UniProtKB/Swiss-Prot annotation:
Top-level lineage group: Eukaryota
Subcellular location: Nucleus, Nucleolus; Nucleus, Nucleoplasm; Golgi apparatus
Protein name in the entry: Protein CBFA2T3
Family matches, as InterPro entries: CBFA2T1/2/3, CBFA2T3, NHR2, TAFH/NHR1_dom_sf, TAFH_NHR1, Znf_MYND
Length: 591
């Protein structure tokens, strides 16, 4: 693991490999193909190798002591094989060509390996959190994204990670992160620039590129976390794996992953040399392209174009071994980036021009609507003035003389109120006030018309009710008259009958002593029927002599004849005093 005591690691073919320029030299599958063999102790100011051996030497990085990060130094980029990695972990697809951003500081293979280690480290942390619980795994994922996005410092990440997992990390973690995290952040920044996004947006959309469990072989979590029984000491790593002797038949999974360490950007790298095809020397071909990641393909195209069309500002600059040129990459723009910037500026100016044109059209439409509103306001004010003149109702004699003046006055008011004014003195409040007055006048007229309609409807309803009431009263009067006629008919029928009582209709046993015509069943019915009978009693005896009529007790001597008319009957009834007594025949019968 990185972070231990600095030491030199041996590579099977890093010091004494055969010269690739020799035609008859045998080449091992895992040996570098086109890198000139040179000892590790080469000084920084040593002149570059001949062009026949290394193509594009101006971009070839130097092997200075600054390249020994975390105590591990590695060989240059391998073309057809997988260089040995510490702890025997194969880089896999995680050796992204985007790691070549750090080639001005580290050798390409070293930068790619450090990025691969960092990604495996972060992936292992997340898997360890998921093994504890899904909640802790989510918290660890959030902390990792915050660390890569630079929203958390390394110390804050370290403290919060220990708080979330309750496991202390090994001492080498913080130096490892401080040494390798800038590489990952520069890779993220460059990928985000290519995708025209911010680093946070790019990381949110391509999170699987950072935390992909299948991208590389995860590290054992016990190598990152301290155990209680170890008393703060980490276990000794396997020296055979660190020395690259991991090609054991017991580890076939590394052999299956080894062809994927060749990214497209490394195939098109100028350090490969033009004398070799992209697939390299006799080596089994790699897996299909779908095993590469998207960022590998994008970075391959980017660097291929960058090497084909080199920046003319960089051509006269010779390569200075050991010099740091990250500022040039970060702050200087290539012709392609300048073209993109000018394209963005052009689009922005076009958008601004479109907005200005739309604003002008909107102002024109508003001005036309304002003129139409003025005309409609003038129309309503003219109608209002005419209605006011009609309401005032000037005398007929004065109306012809005053009509012209009264019609001119509203026109003058209208022109005075709505005359075209300069834009500076134009008050929208007056327009709104006059518009509200016109609308209120229309409302008042509508309400007056509605009230008139309601009053007319009420009047018609009252008339209809009165007519119906008169009809009902006439019907009731007719019914009463019909009932009285029916009663008289019944009485007449009773008068014709001599055997039934005139009051109740039962069998009669007595006769009225006044007229000797009315028949009753008893004195009760005679008294009950007296109110109706006294009008006709005695009319049949007008031609008879008076002494023949028996007199009753308390009854007058002579009964005056009843008039046939209702007035005579009323006067005759008034002249009679009280109710007649029981006739003599009735008294004799009762005895």
């Amino acid at each position: 693991m990185p972070g231990g005591t600095p030491r030199l690691e041996g590579h099977p073919f890093s010091k004494t490999g055969p010269d690739p320029a020799t035609p008859g030299a045998a080449t091992m599958p895992d040996s570098p193909a086109d890198v000139k063999t040179q000892p590790r102790s080469t000084p920084p100011n040593m002149p570059p190798p001949p062009p026949a051996v290394t193509q594009g030497a101006t971009r070839h990085p130097s092997f200075t002591p600054s390249t020994m990060m975390n105590g591990s130094s590695h060989s240059p980029t391998a073309i057809n094989g997988a260089p040995s990695t510490p702890n025997g972990f194969s880089n896999g697809p995680a050796t992204s060509s985007s790691a070549s951003l750090s080639t001005h500081q580290l050798p390409p293979a070293c930068g790619a390996r450090q990025l691969s280690k960092l990604k495996r480290f972060l992936t292992t942390l997340q898997q360890f959190g998921n093994d504890i619980s899904p909640e802790i795994g989510e918290r660890v994922r959030t902390l990792v994204l915050g660390l890569v996005n630079s929203t958390l410092t390394i110390e804050e990440f370290h403290a919060k990670l220990q708080e979330a997992t309750n496991f202390p990390l090994r001492p080498f973690v913080i130096p490892f992160l401080k040494a390798n995290l800038p590489l990952l952040q520069r890779e993220l920044l460059h990928c985000a620039r290519m995708a025209k996004q911010s680093p946070a947006q790019y990381l949110a959309q391509h999170e699987q590129l950072l935390l992909d469990a299948n991208a590389s072989s995860p590290i054992d979590s016990s190598e990152l976390l301290l155990e209680v029984s170890e008393s703060g000491k980490r276990r000794t790593p396997d020296r055979t794996k660190e020395n690259g002797l991991d090609r054991d038949p017991l580890h076939p999974e590394h052999l299956s992953k080894r062809p994927c360490t060749m990214s497209p950007a490394q195939r098109y790298s100028p350090s490969n040399g033009l004398s070799h095809p992209p697939n390299g020397l006799p080596h089994p071909p790699g897996p299909p392209p779908q095993h590469y990641r998207l960022e590998d393909m994008a970075m391959a195209h980017h660097y291929r174009d960058a090497y084909r069309h080199a920046d003319p500002r960089e051509r006269p600059r010779p390569a200075v071994h050991g010099a740091r040129q990250e500022e040039v990459i970060d702050h200087r723009l290539t012709d392609r980036e300048w073209a993109e910037e000018w394209k963005h500026l052009n689009n922005l100016l076009n958008c601004i021009m479109d907005m200005v044109e739309k604003t002008r059209r909107s102002l024109t439409v508003l001005r036309r609507c304002q003129e139409a509103d003025r005309e409609e306001l003038n129309h309503w004010i003219r109608r209002y003035s005419d209605a006011e003149d009609m309401k005032k109702g000037s005398p007929p004699s004065a109306r012809p003389h005053n009509s012209s003046s009264s019609s001119e006055a509203p026109q003058l008011d209208v022109h005075r109120d709505f005359a075209p004014r300069p834009l500076s003195g134009y008050m929208p409040e007056e327009i709104w006030r006059k518009a509200e007055e016109a609308v209120n006048e229309v409302k008042r007229q509508a309400m007056s018309e509605l009230q008139k309609a309601v009053s007319d409807a009420e009047r018609k309803a009252h008339e209809l009710i009165t007519t119906e009431r008169a009809k009902m009263e006439r019907a009731l009067a007719e019914a009463k008259r019909q009932a009285s006629e029916d009663a008289l008919t019944v009485i007449n029928q009773q008068e014709d009958s001599s055997e039934s009582c005139w009051n109740c209709g039962r069998k009669a046993s007595e006769t009225c002593s006044g007229c000797n015509t009315a028949r009753y069943c008893g004195s009760f019915c005679q008294h009950k029927d007296w109110e109706k009978h006294h009008h006709v009693c005695g009319q049949t005896l007008q031609g008879l002599p008076a002494p023949s009529v028996p007199t009753a007790v308390g009854q007058p001597e002579a009964v005056p004849p009843m008039a046939s008319s209702p007035s005579d009957a009323g006067s005759a009834g008034a002249s009679r005093a009280g109710t007649p007594g029981t006739p003599a025949p009735l008294e004799s019968a009762s005895r």
